[in-house]
Design a protein with these regions (language model features):
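Generic marker of residues within folded, mature protein domains
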Residues: 2, 13-15, 35, 42, ...
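Extended hydrophobic/aromatic-rich secondary-structure runs
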Residues: 2-7, 100-107, 241-246
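Bacterial Sec-dependent N-terminal signal peptides
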Residues: 1-29
Length: 276
């Protein structure tokens, strides 16, 4: 059963990160400019698997997020073949400007790329006057929590050790998170087609360097198309098991990792150039 509670501002920042415990939340000076902060009175809405933290005028959005997250979680756990280990925290801002100003001086740089932010296993989302976009942010946040917990654990010490041992390309893990959080769509297909037909990329490495998220998402969708959907998460599992992408690809694709990337480029060229 869901429940509401109020928390103090100090408690809220402890929940977000121990690093912000000494932060000033009323005003910060940058040279001659002074930035005024809103003062938020924080509450949280709790469900079986999520705590949604919100402030004034955010209660209905918090309910929407909590219900959406609970609805999406079982399907995403099934696709990831991994379950949420503990209740996840979602920090909700009513608008992007509030999210920006609340973190000035805290050493966190929010970039306006329309995506979910993850801070120490806590999802930070903001409302863009579009509930579908908010739901997508939540899906991507769940995908990121599930993926990173599975790959690296959810303890800070465990994460650091596992990241050192498991040296996967960032485009690969970010692409899997995007794949898990957002179904392939006409918009994504058009974006990929535009990149492939641009003629800018003769090798996948150049494509992944320039456009890591679409390249990574497209790679996993390619694995689904070419090697079956059930083998997408299995390939990631093999990569973590062997700690070696070549061994993982040889096991599933019967090819080395670099050969799979060449196959990806050839596959996309054939698919999109035949439409010209």
């Amino acid at each position: 059963m869901a429940k509401f509670s109020r928390i103090s501002l100090i408690s809220f920042f402890i929940i977000i990160s121990a690093a912000v415990a000494n932060a000033q939340v009323n005003a910060v000076e940058f040279g001659k400019n002074r930035v005024q902060f809103k003062k938020f009175k924080w509450y949280y809405y709790q469900t079986k698997n999520f705590n949604v933290y919100y402030y004034q005028n955010g209660e209905e959005l918090a309910k929407f997020i909590a219900q959406s997250a609970e609805k999406e979680l079982p399907q995403m756990e099934s696709a990831a073949e991994y379950s949420l280990q503990r209740r996840a925290n979602i920090i909700l801002y009513n608008e992007y400007a509030d999210m920006q100003q609340s973190n000035i001086g805290l050493g966190i740089d929010w970039q306006n790329n329309g995506g979910t932010k993850l801070v120490n296993n806590k999802m930070v989302v903001y409302f863009e006057a579009d509930h579908q976009k908010l739901r997508l942010q939540v899906r991507k946040g769940i995908a990121q929590i599930l993926t990173e917990n599975r790959l690296f654990g959810d303890d800070i010490g465990e994460i650091a050790g596992n990241q050192a041992l498991l040296d996967l390309p960032k485009w690969l893990t970010d692409g899997y998170i995007s794949y898990l959080g957002q179904n392939w769509s006409t918009e994504l297909d058009d974006e990929l087609k535009s990149e492939i037909l641009s003629g800018n990329y003769t090798k996948f490495s150049k494509f992944a360097f320039a456009r890591p998220q679409i390249a990574g998402h497209a790679f996993w969708y390619f694995i689904e198309e070419k090697y079956k959907k059930e083998n997408v998460t299995y390939l990631l599992y093999l990569a973590t098991l062997y700690k070696n992408l070549n061994k993982a690809c040889l096991k599933e694709c019967k090819k080395k990792f670099k050969e799979v990337l060449v196959e990806f480029m050839e596959y996309q060229d054939e698919k999109y150039y035949r439409d010209i």
